[in-house]
Amino acid sequence: MTEIKTQVREIADVQRVRLRSQYANELFIDQSEDESLTIEATPRVLERIETTVDGGLLSIDLAGGIGDRIRDALTTSLTRPHVVIRLSLRQLRGLDIAALAYIRVRRFETDTLDLLFNGPGEIEFDHLQADTLSVTNSGPGMIRLAGQVSQQDVSLRGPGEFAARDMLSKQTRISVNGIGNATIWAEEQLDVTISGIGGVLYMGSPVVRSKISPMGSLARLGDR
């Protein structure tokens, strides 16, 4: 059996998180006054994971030379190392993910949040409370949100999905440039632009302004 070890890394004053990795990653984030970071992986994998904090940005990257990079590129679903990251933060204003990752964020309150996702996997918030939310999903992954925000700006640039039927938003602007799909709950204003063959489903009775390509679709699901 492969040995798994848990390593504690020192962090302080983190507000944004950036993850770059060829591994299979699980990242669990919760809100706490006591900041902490633990990583679970094999000893060899732990040696390659670099964590730095600079200007409030926590970067999680892979170290290694050209040989390591080649081996990373040749990994498959059967050989790809697995990493579990547990993170407790006082504040979260940015999440930038370019990796195969499953990310679970429990209840979190913040003034503003920027989500950037480019990779397979899923980002899920159990309950998000924010004034403003900006989302860019450029890959095939799923972003699933519940909670409440005042304003949100969503951009789907690939085949990914945005599932937010359980997150109330007063003002929503969404653009779909590929084959992505979104489900949202809008209360006051909804601006939709679809230039690909994707679709948007919405709940609620907002004032709707739309610009839809012939292959795109916009439909109302009804009230909550």
Give the location of each predicted region.
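Intrinsically disordered, low-complexity terminal regions
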Residues: 1-224
